[in-house]
């Protein structure tokens, strides 16, 4: 990460008083940021350092200190369960944990011994461990980012500083980042996308990065969103750019449709992390939101492609300059040119390409289109192949439906498990599905559905930390109800 640190030093000389980082309580100019990095870096020891912290200036400063020290930075998602955090600590062989949540660490480590570290006017606890190193790190590992996955324990993706910088530089180039930009981060900094889009790219470009704590901007856990606080944060910061997941965009669109005022400062809103309904994107654009889809994965150091102004709205954009995309014969998206070194504890990655597990195509203009997941696509009993994400994104584009999962592998018709926006919205779902069915080919229509008992979340094991639904877990949880739908039992039906 030498080039990023050099950029910060350069901007500290060129524009010393220009705002670099800000959160709810702290503002750091580029000069102050450089001074804080130089002050804090010598105080942080260890070789594998975990960060269990809320968003804020301190998170960014500590992470940059670790890069300066040549130490592996290991973000620890605050939305992980205690079991998953324990797995991460053991799997990564952490020797230091820096946290603003000491009680969680005390519970896990069964020790209260820690030292105090002050960063960006905030005090943190430093826990020093004596781990048995399970796995050597691949050469030049700068960051280990844990994917929450949909099955099994989280996996550590080992990335070099060079691979992260290539994405940072490409992203800054294609979005034409400039010093006047104000970039607001509304995703947890424990996610790689938030690191790159919310910290590295702004600082590489001389822009200003705003890192409010998650609760203050309306984020609760990995899935909860308070629309009032979210919109208040947007209007207070007046950002020129931000990154949203589809559910956050849906909340903004619904609020704006009810008369809420959104800032007119935005020139670029990236949406990614899950399939986004074309209907929702159109609604957002009609409200004046400059939304563009992106696509990426941790194994490619985050962003692979980005939609841009003046380009097609129904794609996830062209691949960034630093990476190559190829479509395999079976439709799977293959990426090369900027890949991870290995999963921690596993053999080094081999080959020049990585199979993403996503299905898609490149159009005649070189724009990438995602149609579904290779593992989730299914064939009906009539031999028609279907990517369920397509139907699910159409369902959740309606305000009455928050989440939905489609089933139909080898069956005569499709069924769905649906989460309504609230109890009063449940009666509206029949109308929503009826209208949608009239726009779908016969093999894609929903014939029967049931209302879920509760939202699909990380806490109940029905979604991962990024909000991606765990289809297998949902199918297992509702197996008997799904089977009854196919046997003609009690359910909602259009047969």
PLM regions and their residue ranges:
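Conserved AMP-binding/adenylation subdomain of ANL enzymes
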Residues: 165-182, 189-241, 246-250, 254-257
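AMP-dependent adenylate-forming
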Residues: 6-28, 453-455
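Conserved AMP-binding/adenylate-forming core of the ANL superfamily
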Residues: 17-46, 50, 54-56, 64, ...
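Gly/Ser/Thr-rich phosphate-binding loop
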Residues: 205-207, 239-243, 253-311
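Conserved AMP-binding A3 loop
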Residues: 29-30, 142-169
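AMP-binding/adenylate-forming catalytic core of the ANL superfamily
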Residues: 80, 331, 336-337, 359-444, ...
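Conserved ATP/PPi-binding loop(s) of AMP-dependent carboxylate-activating enzymes
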Residues: 315-319, 328-354, 367, 382-386
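Conserved pre-ATP/AMP-binding loop-to-beta segment of ANL
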Residues: 124-146, 153, 176-183
